[in-house]
Amino acid sequence: MLRLQNLPKLVRRFATTALPKTETTTLKNGLTVATEHHPYAQTATVLVGVDAGSRAETAKNNGAAHFLEHLAFKGTKNRSQKALELEFENTGAHLNAYTSREQTVYYAHAFKNAVPNAVAVLADILTNSSISASAVERERQVILREQEEVDKMADEVVFDHLHATAYQGHPLGRTILGPKENIESLTREDLLQYIKDNYRSDRMIISSAGSISHEELVKLAEKYFGHLEPSAEQLSLGAPRGLKPRFVGSEIRARDDDSPTANIAIAVEGMSWKHPDYFTALVMQAIIGNWDRAMGASPHLSSRLSTIVQQHQLANSFMSFSTSYSDTGLWGIYLVTENLGRIDDLVHFTLQNWARLTVATRAEVERAKAQLRASLLLSLDSTTAIAEDIGRQLLTTGRRMSPQEVDLRIGQITEKDVARVASEMIWDKDIAVSAVGSIEGLLDYNRIRSSISMNRW
């Protein structure tokens, strides 16, 4: 028999490492610095986010933000394009950028000893970009080819049309790339003016995650970004800029009978980033779920809609979405089907499942909450993901919710919350419809709208 008294005593000789916290500092010029320090990390990601994307453009310069993203790595007043590339290749660092409707983001992922240089390069790119006339002409051709490729992608076209019809007459309804005529006509002066108007210190954040400490990044930010000037009328981070868009119940259809599929998006007005029911809308999205017929376990998914679609072969795939902006959002579903004779059935069962959200069961809500937790929290598995999360939250809400707070907020959602939000957001509300491809079988707008005009549950 094992004698427990002879076993060595278990003595804890270390302290549990405290969870990393987000530290925030605002410089004198209004620029915000936020960090999550991981002292044992050997790399760090530093991100510079600008609270300006295609929404900050006019009809004349629509496409400027994306154009500048292309020009970012083509050289500065201090570094040629070749020097920029060599500087990062020699240190093993990674540099990238992307543009959305409300933000433009530049970030660098580097080893610990190369982080200060990465910050210097990011500052050089954002504040000293040369934007030569020859580089503008070269990138113009690249962007035109990119637009040609995007125009061949049904999902991109559908979602651009969805924004255009839902936010008619508002900058949020414009595309990120801009129309072809703008791409062909934007000048160096137009791009420099966009930088002057929007790349202001109070509209920028620097976030990091990994090896660099908060104090060190603040010093680097003061050194390389301290000379930037704020806007004439300063707004706090996360504050809406410009008029709130009016959601318009409407549709855009682009019928192409040569297409093998119908591609359809249906949406209601969703939640902004700051809306108290933001997470409830995400839970509702998870209840509706995503489905693709290539998924081997599709008959056993928790989504009721996926079961119906799979059993009756109504679609190739569907994807629910909850897209948020500073003062509005789009909540809906994207459907792809080659069963063109049953499009009406597909739309009917989709909206019927939207209606069922007012009577969602506790089991459905708890399962969706678990899926949402996994989606939001398990994705924070790298310094780049964490830096992006910090930057996005600061730009959209003005503060960062810790993973623990996110988990708590999701955990507090009940089936009553889902029923209330579904009733307020979906029932008898206008919808925006965007459809591309072989859509002869998609019935008229009023027929689709009437499916959610009466609550029978």
From Swiss-Prot:
Give its E.C. classification number. 3.4.24.64
Q: List the subcellular locations.
A: Mitochondrion matrix
Catalytic residue list: E69 (proton acceptor)
What do the Gene Ontology cellular component annotations say?
A: mitochondrial processing peptidase complex; mitochondrion
Top enzyme class of this protein? Answer: hydrolase
Q: Which UniProt keywords apply?
A: Hydrolase, Metal-binding, Metalloprotease, Mitochondrion, Protease, Transit peptide, Zinc
Instruction: State the needed cofactors, names only.
Output: Zn(2+)
InterPro entries linked: Metalloenz_LuxS/M16, MPP/UQCRC_Complex, Pept_M16_N, Pept_M16_Zn_BS, Peptidase_M16_C
Catalytic activity, reaction form: Release of N-terminal transit peptides from precursor proteins imported into the mitochondrion, typically with Arg in position P2
- One family from Pfam that matches here is Peptidase_M16_C
Annotated residues for binding of Zn(2+): H66, H70, E146
Instruction: Please give the activity regulation comment for this entry.
Output: Binding to mas2 is required for catalytic activity.
Gene Ontology biological process terms, A to Z: protein processing involved in protein targeting to mitochondrion
What is the protein's quaternary organization? Answer: Heterodimer of mas2 (alpha) and qcr1 (beta) subunits, forming the mitochondrial processing protease (MPP) in which mas2 is involved in substrate recognition and binding and qcr1 is the catalytic subunit.
What is the name listed in the Swiss-Prot or TrEMBL entry for this protein?
Probable mitochondrial-processing peptidase subunit beta
